[in-house]
């Protein structure tokens, strides 16, 4: 039997904190152990409460989420961190940086004005990610994808990399080790909103000897890209 997952909610918006806590309280596997309204409080409460998971807003007063994250990785290394980010170019850039600093995952803040839709979007993404981070038993997905289109006979040589939790940091470590003359095309699958994949590709391109770019529809595959 799984023990309850202890969660600390960090956001400067009282409305957002209440929204997140009310969503998480509906799941019997999750226990809200505390709330914080800025990075300074987050560091103090993380040391005191020792949560399993911390949901951390990026834009906050006194100490922003990125600065707080740097402290949390040193002072509360056993707590998993999920970043909350706005669906903007600035938010995407900050999120990719957070993932490179050691954040374990992220959830985009809903852009919809509908309260019900906001609740549904956060609930759909946040709860499974919290459970996955701590190894909580999740039900198997029963939905079967449509069959893939058959390829013409022949030899297709590519390197495929699929990543999930902790993906961006792992990708950077892998790509750093690959030579610039890598002999086959590389395909990376990472589930992210479009703005985030653009920022991720740009960051990986800076740290890799290979050319890394966001894929375009119909673009031919090239060796070493």
Where does each model-flagged region fall?
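Strand-loop microenvironment adjacent to phosphate/nucleotide-handling motifs in alpha/beta enzyme folds
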Residues: 1-225
């Amino acid at each position: 039997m799984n023990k309850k997952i202890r969660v600390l909610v960090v956001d400067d918006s009282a409305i957002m904190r209440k929204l997140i806590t009310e969503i998480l309280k509906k799941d019997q596997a999750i226990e809200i152990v505390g709330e914080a309204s800025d990075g300074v409080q987050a560091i103090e409460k993380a040391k005191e409460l020792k949560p399993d998971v911390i949901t951390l807003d990026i834009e906050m007063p006194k100490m922003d989420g990125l600065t707080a994250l740097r402290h949390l990785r040193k002072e509360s290394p056993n707590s998993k961190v999920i970043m909350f980010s706005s669906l903007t170019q600035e938010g995407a850039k900050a999120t990719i940086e957070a993932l490179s600093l050691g954040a374990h995952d992220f959830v985009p803040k809903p852009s919809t004005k509908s309260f019900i839709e906001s609740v549904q979007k956060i609930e759909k993404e946040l709860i499974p990610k919290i459970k996955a981070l701590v190894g909580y038993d999740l039900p198997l997905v029963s939905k079967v994808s449509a069959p893939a289109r058959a390829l013409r006979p022949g030899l297709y040589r590519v390197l495929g990399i699929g990543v999930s939790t902790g993906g961006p940091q792992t990708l950077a470590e892998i790509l750093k080790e690959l030579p610039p003359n890598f002999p086959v095309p590389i395909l990376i699958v990472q589930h992210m909103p479009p703005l985030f994949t653009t920022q991720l590709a740009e960051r990986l391109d800076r740290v890799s000897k290979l050319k890394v770019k966001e894929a375009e529809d119909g673009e031919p595959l090239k060796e070493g890209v």
